From Swiss-Prot:
Note: This peptide is an evolutionarily optimized stable analog of somatostatin. In addition, it adopts nearly identical conformations as in the somatostatin drug analog Octreotide. As this drug, it contains a D-Trp at the same position, whose synthesis is a common strategy used for enhancing the metabolic stability of compounds in drug design. Consomatins evolved by gene duplication of a 'Somatostatin and related peptides (SSRP)' gene expressed in the snail neuroendocrine system.
Tissue expression remark: Expressed by the venom duct.
Domain free text: The cysteine framework is C-C.
Entry function: Moderately activates human somatostatin receptors (SSTR) with a preferential activation of SSTR1 and SSTR4. In vivo, does not cause behavioral changes in mice within a few minutes of intracranial injection, but causes a progressive loss of movement thereafter. Four to five hours after injection, mice recover, even with the highest dose tested. Shows antinociception and antihyperalgesia activities in two mouse models of acute pain, most probably by acting outside the central nervous system.
Prosegment residue ranges: 23-57, 74-80
Disulphide bridges: C63-C68
PTM annotation (D-tryptophan): residues: W65
Family (UniProt): Belongs to the conotoxin C superfamily. Consomatin family.
Name listed for the protein in its UniProt record: Consomatin Mrc1
Lineage of producing organism: Eukaryota, Metazoa, Spiralia, Lophotrochozoa, Mollusca
Source species of the chain: Conus mercator (Trader cone)
Length: 80
């Protein structure tokens, strides 16, 4: 518990110390984030990693209490 308290205190000092030297809060917060991290970059990386819904539906089988549903029913001729 004491460690968490001191971590919190040090974080507050780390953020507020530049403010006491005349810095602006927005500049201090921006200084905590790397320059190459932008909302657009984060969104693009999330979209590129997400598989399409059809791939997820065809590959993921959800099991409850170790009871899995049978694979999707297919017609004998191999269509649909």
């Amino acid at each position: 518990m004491q460690t968490a308290y001191w971590v919190m205190v040090m974080m507050m000092v780390w953020i507020t110390a530049p403010l006491s030297e005349g810095g602006k809060l927005n500049d201090v917060i921006r200084g905590l984030v790397p320059d190459d991290v932008t909302p657009q970059l984060i969104l693009r990386s999330l979209i590129s990693r997400r598989p399409s819904d059809s791939v997820v539906r065809s590959t993921v089988h959800i099991c409850y209490w170790k009871v899995c549903p049978p694979p999707p029913w297919r017609r004998p001729n191999g269509k649909g």
